[in-house]
């Protein structure tokens, strides 16, 4: 009789060891940066997207950017004047909560601030995000942007999408070869995909994507920075919850 898979014992020692080694490496890498860089920024990210963060790393390739556990990051910098790894560095600890990261740099702080002020990327919203505006699809023939641009500058929705639109809850139908809400003359109710301020589910985000409507904006917020020369921390935003999720461990 073959051995039951349920009876199989999985050894988790190796996984635990790997995680511990990653944390130790992150801790050491942060501490190694402290004497080699003039400034350390704490930042948070709205609507995290790995591909956009890679662009940031490429642009700031002479800096070091860390994403890691906030408690570990705080310990690496020091949380009190007694254990701070440099004068005043412990003052950054109050900004290390939620989904935040560190940027070590020798660039002038004004250059870093200017770069991030001008950095925004729009993207499709994900489930769990909050709608930034109300999206209403007008009745009548459907167009690819759902009324976001005038019909004369848009193209009709492909008939192949009609079954999926219906499956996602839109009361669509085919009228003379066109995908319509109501009838071709526009008689019928408009369809509200989402209302401003509501939390989006996967059905709503799929509909938004089908109509090429972007409600998400990738943005980096600089919260504060420490300067080695003065030992002072300059606040750029009031400390608070930068995000509910812990940061991923990444020290590249």
UniProtKB/Swiss-Prot annotation:
Subcellular localization, as worded in the UniProt entry: Nucleus, Nucleolus; Cytoplasm
Highest taxon, organism lineage: Eukaryota
Keyword Lyase: no
Entry-linked InterPro entries: Mrt4 (IPR033867), Ribosomal_uL10 (IPR001790), Ribosomal_uL10-like_insert (IPR040637), Ribosomal_uL10-like_insert_sf (IPR043164), Ribosomal_uL10-like_sf (IPR043141), Ribosome_Assembly_uL10 (IPR051742)
One GO cellular component, as annotated: nucleolus
Gene Ontology BP annotations: nuclear-transcribed mRNA catabolic process; ribosomal large subunit assembly; ribosomal large subunit biogenesis; ribosomal large subunit export from nucleus; rRNA processing
Summary of the function given for this chain in its UniProt record: Component of the ribosome assembly machinery. Nuclear paralog of the ribosomal protein P0, it binds pre-60S subunits at an early stage of assembly in the nucleolus, and is replaced by P0 in cytoplasmic pre-60S subunits and mature 80S ribosomes.
SUPFAM superfamilies from the UniProt entry: Ribosomal protein L10-like
One Pfam family here: RL10P_insert
Keywords: Cytoplasm, Nucleus, Ribosome biogenesis
Broad class of the protein's primary localization: nucleus
Protein's name in the database: Ribosome assembly factor mrt4
Family as reported in the entry's similarity comment: Belongs to the universal ribosomal protein uL10 family.
Oligomer and partners: Associates with the pre-60S ribosomal particle.
